[in-house]
């Protein structure tokens, strides 16, 4: 047995499923998950000593690559001054100033510890600010594991929420309305059915949890217009897209102004950080200045703030996003060319430093139904064969891939060459 197999066997006796987040268990592709010993630049190294070109990037945070010296040094320096104080620090102020400067729609920002905390808190704030209970989310979009967001999407344009996980009361989930991503008609139907009850829409500007599905041109502006028409808030969940699709996020890339923004992943530079913020009048409703309660023992942790501050300063350097786009575009085009040579039907969506691989005969993939029609079994075979070639992709047909500026054009070309060999066997 390999070391990964031995560790996985031991882990399953001690940790539910052997992992601390379900997708890591390789359930979506089968087989034994890799246990990682170290990472550097664009590469992961498993406990058996094999290197992989990494397109998971810790599920998004590693936009600069693994083990970036500026972030590593910032963490070391911060740790020497103490690990946690439970009191305000100068770095929290500097971090808030940096974030609000980089994302102009955020007049104020509150730091938390994860993307889930950010979305959960933003929805509570939207409900408190508007005095309304219902929210709209989109099928195939994931916003963390808060109860109100673990809701199963139905087949119709509009479904009353049904819990997608045991432990979520149906009476609670019923306040979550599920609409179809990239379909404004379904959203208008929800507002017309509940015109005075919907507090907010929460949306991934690029849907990264049904692989990678960018918005159609009219979709995000249409959501903004509907929120204005019916008095609801627009929450853009930029946990994945923030600082990756563009420096000011996908909201800037697509030209839409939210009322609240949720951030995570890159904002922590690899440390556990989330944030939410937006309009000053809305944020003023948050405790201690307002009645909507939110708190956290480790929120604004000095080590996490130091890591995030270092990361964002690096990400803000000229040329970063142009490089991400160039690398991702080359990968997407190369994979499509290689698949076409082998007669394999393939669509690769990409925007900024995100991409998604779909085995499908369709010309495009623009919604949850398109994603569900793709060939998952072929993806599973592709994943494992690419792993044998030393390429680590997301172990699920429903997760986006992530590029970093640490990837070289040689890494990209080697990945395309590996895919060409794999496609020949599919």
From Swiss-Prot:
- InterPro entries named in the record: 4pyrrol_synth_GluAld_NH2Trfase, Aminotrans_3, Aminotrans_3_PPA_site, PyrdxlP-dep_Trfase, PyrdxlP-dep_Trfase_major, PyrdxlP-dep_Trfase_small
According to its UniProt entry, the protein's GO biological process terms are: protoporphyrinogen IX biosynthetic process
UniProt KW keywords: Cytoplasm, Isomerase, Porphyrin biosynthesis, Pyridoxal phosphate
Describe which pathway this protein belongs to, using the record's wording.
Porphyrin-containing compound metabolism; protoporphyrin-IX biosynthesis; 5-aminolevulinate from L-glutamyl-tRNA(Glu): step 2/2
**List of residues that carry N6-(pyridoxal phosphate)lysine:** 265
Per the record, GO CC terms? cytoplasm
Pfam families annotated for this entry? Aminotran_3 (PF00202)
Q: What is its EC number?
A: 5.4.3.8
Disulfide pattern: none
Example of a GO MF term: glutamate-1-semialdehyde 2,1-aminomutase activity
Which catalytic reaction applies to this protein?
A: (S)-4-amino-5-oxopentanoate = 5-aminolevulinate
Assign the protein's first listed, main location to one coarse class: cytoplasm
Please indicate if the UniProt record lists Zinc as a keyword: no
Subcellular location as annotated:
Cytoplasm
Its needed co-factors are: pyridoxal 5'-phosphate
Q: Which family does it belong to?
A: Belongs to the class-III pyridoxal-phosphate-dependent aminotransferase family. HemL subfamily.
The subunit structure is:
Homodimer.
> Which NCBIfam families does this chain map to?
hemL, PRK00062.1
* Full protein name: Glutamate-1-semialdehyde 2,1-aminomutase
Q: Which organism is it from?
A: Salmonella heidelberg (strain SL476)
């Amino acid at each position: 047995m390999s070391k990964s197999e031995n560790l996985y066997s031991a882990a399953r006796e001690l940790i539910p499923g052997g992992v601390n987040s379900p997708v890591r268990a390789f359930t979506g592709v089968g087989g034994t998950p890799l246990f990682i010993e170290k990472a550097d630049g664009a590469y992961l190294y498993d406990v058996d000593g094999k290197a992989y070109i990494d397109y998971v990037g810790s599920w998004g945070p590693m936009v600069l690559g693994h083990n970036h010296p500026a972030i590593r040094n910032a963490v070391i320096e911060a740790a020497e001054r103490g690990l946690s104080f439970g009191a305000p620090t100068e770095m929290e102020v500097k971090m808030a100033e940096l974030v609000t400067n980089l994302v102009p729609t955020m007049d104020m920002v509150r730091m938390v510890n994860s993307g889930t905390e950010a979305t959960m808190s933003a929805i509570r704030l939207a409900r408190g600010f508007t005095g309304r209970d219902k929210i709209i989310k989109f099928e195939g979009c994931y916003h963390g594991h808060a109860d109100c967001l673990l809701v199963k999407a139905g087949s119709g344009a509009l479904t009353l929420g049904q819990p997608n996980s045991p432990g979520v009361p149906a009476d609670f989930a019923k306040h979550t309305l599920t609409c179809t991503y990239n379909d404004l008609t379904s959203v208008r139907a929800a507002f017309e059915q509940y015109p005075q009850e919907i507090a907010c829409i929460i949306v991934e500007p690029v849907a990264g949890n049904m692989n990678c599905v960018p918005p159609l041109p009219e979709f995000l502006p249409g959501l903004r217009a509907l929120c204005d028409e019916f008095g609801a808030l627009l929450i853009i969940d930029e946990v994945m897209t923030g600082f990756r699709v563009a420096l000011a996020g996908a909201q800037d890339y697509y030209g839409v102004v939210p009322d609240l923004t949720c951030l995570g992943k890159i904002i922590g530079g690899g440390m556990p950080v989330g944030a939410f913020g937006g309009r000053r009048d809305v944020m003023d409703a948050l405790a201690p200045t307002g009645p909507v309660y939110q708190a956290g023992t480790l929120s604004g942790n000095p080590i996490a703030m130091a890591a995030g501050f270092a990361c964002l300063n690096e990400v803000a350097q000229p040329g970063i996003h142009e490089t991400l786009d160039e690398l991702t575009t080359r990968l997407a085009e190369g994979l499509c060319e290689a698949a076409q040579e082998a007669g394999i039907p393939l669509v690769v969506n990409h925007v900024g430093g995100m991409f998604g691989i779909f085995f499908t005969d369709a010309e495009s993939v623009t919604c949850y139904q398109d994603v569900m029609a793709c060939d998952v079994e072929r993806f599973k075979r592709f994943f494992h064969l690419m792993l044998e070639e030393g390429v680590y992709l997301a172990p699920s047909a429903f997760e986006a891939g992530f590029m970093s500026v640490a990837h070289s054009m040689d890494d990209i070309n080697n990945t395309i060459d590996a895919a060409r060999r794999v496609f020949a066997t599919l």
